[in-house]
Swiss-Prot record:
Residues 396-589 are annotated as: Beta-Casp. This is Transcription termination factor FttA. Residues 9-76 are annotated as: KHa. Belongs to the metallo-beta-lactamase superfamily. RNA-metabolizing metallo-beta-lactamase-like family. FttA subfamily. Keywords: DNA-binding, Endonuclease, Exonuclease, Hydrolase, Metal-binding, Nuclease, RNA-binding, Transcription, Transcription regulation, Transcription termination, Zinc. Disulfide bonds: none annotated. GO terms for biological process: DNA-templated transcription termination. Binds 2 Zn(2+) ions, which are required for nuclease activity. InterPro entries: aCPSF1, Beta_Casp, KH_dom, KH_dom-like_a/b, KH_sf_prok-type, MBL, Metallo-B-lactamas, RibonucZ/Hydroxyglut_hydro. SUPFAM superfamilies: Metallo-hydrolase/oxidoreductase (SSF56281), Prokaryotic type KH domain (KH-domain type II) (SSF54814). Residues 1-179 are annotated as: Not required for dimerization, required for cleavage at some sites. Residues 185-395 are annotated as: Metallo-beta-lactamase N-terminus. Zn(2+) 1 binds at H253, H255, H341, D364.
Length: 648
């Protein structure tokens, strides 16, 4: 370790020599240090660098590093003074709603209803803010819905700024350590989510680095730890955790089967490194993780982890936008690309060993446009191995066309409301809920739906997070929000359910209603309570719009089971008779169906040498792998959990 520190110090010494030659003296450099995947140059006079628009680019080109210029902490105005000055500089018409300081990066976030007025003509107002307060301003439009999750994350990052900076410096020194070995081999090991859906975890190993992609929990199998959690018993994984060798964890998206076990690692001090993901994924996975342990507690179970462990996840997360390239170890470079599955979902591209090998790991993805998101990216700089999901990889897994699915949804709703019934749509709080909301809002606007739409569980909070990241939404939605001035998420037809009393009032009411409630597979959350009480009435309908995993209550109901034993409030088992109509409309899935999966392999560029199918029931993974090999002549594999494949 001492040797590694000495090596990094020498690298920094060499860098300082180059920077001092290229940066004008009036910038007054005070410190140069690696922080996370960036080289940070602290200066007392940032304007001296900013006035030369090409200097940072030239530095990055020479040093082959991502460069960030930050004001020296000593020149930053105290937050109270800086905030007062910002309000004096920015016109009142900008309607600033929030100012948040992040001392760990010397940045001030300014939320305003009219961000253009904060920026000013040709950026004049922004430059004046920088000049006067020294903090680096970041301007965003005020989200129309306030998210408690986003607020609490900002508070944590601000209060933990000193620890955060220390952590980032440790990460930076680890990334830019001198490699002990030249990259010669690459392997991947399935720790979860191979020939199954749930607990996704993939370990990438080189002779220099260890990187984990996803670390999820199978919420449908919590009573069986061997099926619920990734394989901690894998010898190589035990070794990596014990020796503290894991360089990074990358999270493709927020759903618990991909992110749900992250806090567990911090609870038991198994990991202290960086987590890379997109900003929306960070916020959404924190929301889902908190809800997960709250549901466990309400069910009388010991939660897998504590709120303080989720706080550690926040402190250790480094966010990247789509297309940003970052070094995450001496021989691995990461880029995240749109996956089209849920807000912020990403395809992980790993460039290994300076051209030795390139891997794209799709996570969950969708390859057609939806109301909510653009289709998954299929173009990469280089690509040799493609690891892709197979949720709907079976030969007959053809989803209903989206237009037909929407018409069918409205048809079932009309029939149910006409007979005085209620419609229950169990939906994942993140993704399917917002997709269905957009469909219902569109039809309600033209008068095709005339009933209240209730949103229960975390759906409203998740929707608030969606409104905070409009740049991640579909082009059509962005046009509606910014050009047409209409935000469909704010429609009057949506009514968030605040508590259990309101929930019971909706159930007891004689009025027809549409209810969208989490969870999507009926494995906890308010959707289960609605189901219990609405199922016996034949006037009601339940509509499944997303995948129902094996072993879930949702799969039982979907499969036609008409009598289901369930535990009541007093702990007694009661048999629920399912007299309500049961419908499945698969055209709303956030997963690519068989045609999309095959089309993705046909369209992805460059064409990979090898395709590995994961995240699907065994036969679907095998079927997809076989079909890809036959049609495209590519090498394919459908490995099991614990299988290791050498890629190079």
């Amino acid at each position: 370790m001492i040797k590694r520190e000495t090596q990094v110090d020498q690298i920094l010494k060499d860098i300082r020599g180059i920077v001092n030659q290229m940066v004008p003296r009036e910038a007054k450099i005070t410190e140069i240090e690696f922080e996370g995947p960036e080289l940070v140059i602290y200066v007392k006079n940032p304007e001296a660098i900013m006035k030369d628009g090409e200097l940072i680019k030239d530095l990055a080109k020479v040093l082959k590093k991502r460069i960030s210029i930050r004001p020296d902490p000593d020149v930053l105005l105290p937050p109270e003074e800086a905030e007062k000055l910002i309000f004096e500089i920015v016109p009142k018409e900008a309607e600033i709603t929030n100012i948040a300081f992040d001392p760990s990066v010397g940045e001030v976030l300014i939320e305003a209803k009219k961000p253009g007025l904060v920026i000013g003509k040709n950026g004049e107002t922004l430059r004046l803010i920088t000049q006067k307060v020294k903090w680096a301003p970041k301007v965003v439009r005020t989200p129309p819905l306030q998210s408690q999750t986003i607020y609490s994350i900002r508070q944590i990052l601000q209060s933990e700024s000193k620890d955060r900076r220390k952590f980032l410096r440790q990460v930076g020194r680890n990334i830019y350590r001198k490699p002990e070995y030249k990259s010669r081999w690459i392997r991947i090991t399935g720790l979860g989510g191979f020939r199954e859906v749930g607990r996704s975890a993939l370990l990438v190993q080189t002779d220099e680095s260890y990187v984990l992609v996803d670390f999820g929990v199978n919420v449908a199998a919590l009573n069986d730890p061997y099926k619920a959690f990734p394989h901690f018993d894998a010898p190589e994984f035990q070794y990596v955790l014990k020796e503290g060798l894991l360089d990074a964890i990358i999270i493709t998206h927020a759903h618990l089967d991909h992110s749900g076990m992250l806090p567990y690692l911090f609870r038991y001090n198994l990991f202290d490194g960086p987590i890379y993901t997109t900003p929306p994924t960070r916020d959404l996975m924190v929301l889902l993780q908190k809800d997960f342990i709250e549901i466990q507690q309400s069910n009388g179970q010991d939660p897998l982890y504590r709120p303080r462990d989720i706080k550690e996840v926040i402190k250790h997360t480094i966010t990247l936008d789509y297309g940003e390239v970052r070094d995450i170890s001496p021989d691995i470079r990461l880029t995240l690309h749109n996956a089209g599955h849920i807000l912020g979902s990403a395809i992980v591209h790993l460039h290994i060993g300076n051209g030795l090998h390139n891997i794209a790991i799709t996570g969950d993805f969708k390859f057609i446009p939806t109301r909510l998101l653009e289709p998954a990216n299929a173009k990469f700089p280089r690509l040799e191995t493609l690891v892709m999901e197979s949720t709907y990889g079976g030969a007959n897994d053809i989803q209903m066309p989206r237009e037909e699915a929407e018409k069918r949804l409205i048809e079932v709703i009309h029939q149910t409301l006409k007979r005085g019934g209620k419609v229950l749509i169990p939906a994942m709080a993140v993704g399917r809920a917002q997709e269905v909301m957009m469909v219902l809002e569109d039809y309600a606007r033209i008068g095709a739906i005339d009933a209240p739409i209730y949103l229960d569980g975390m759906i409203w909070e998740a929707t608030a997070i969606h409104t905070a990241y409009p740049e991640y939404l579909s082009r059509r939605l962005r046009e509606q929000i910014f050009k047409e001035g209409y935000n469909p998420f704010l429609s009057e037809i949506f009514h968030p359910v605040a508590n259990s009393k309101e929930r019971q009032d909706i159930i007891d009411s004689n009025e027809p209603a549409i209810i969208i409630a989490s969870s999507g597979m009926l494995v906890g959350g308010p959707s289960v309570e609605y189901f219990k009480q609405l199922a016996p009435d034949p006037r009601n309908s339940i509509i499944f719009v997303s995948y129902q995993a094996e072993g879930t209550l949702g799969r039982q109901v979907q499969s036609g089971v008409r009598e289901i034993p369930m535990v009541g409030e007093e702990g007694r088992t009661e048999v629920i008779k399912v007299n309500m109509e049961v419908h499945t409309i698969d055209g709303f899935s956030g997963h690519a169906d068989r045609r999309e999966l095959m089309n993705y392999v046909a369209k992805v560029r460059p064409r990979p040498e090898r395709v590995i199918t994961v995240h699907g029931e065994p036969q679907k993974c095998l079927d997809l792998a076989t079909s890809i090999h036959r049609k495209f002549g590519l090498s394919t594999r459908a490995p099991n959990n614990l299988d290791t494949i050498r890629l190079r």
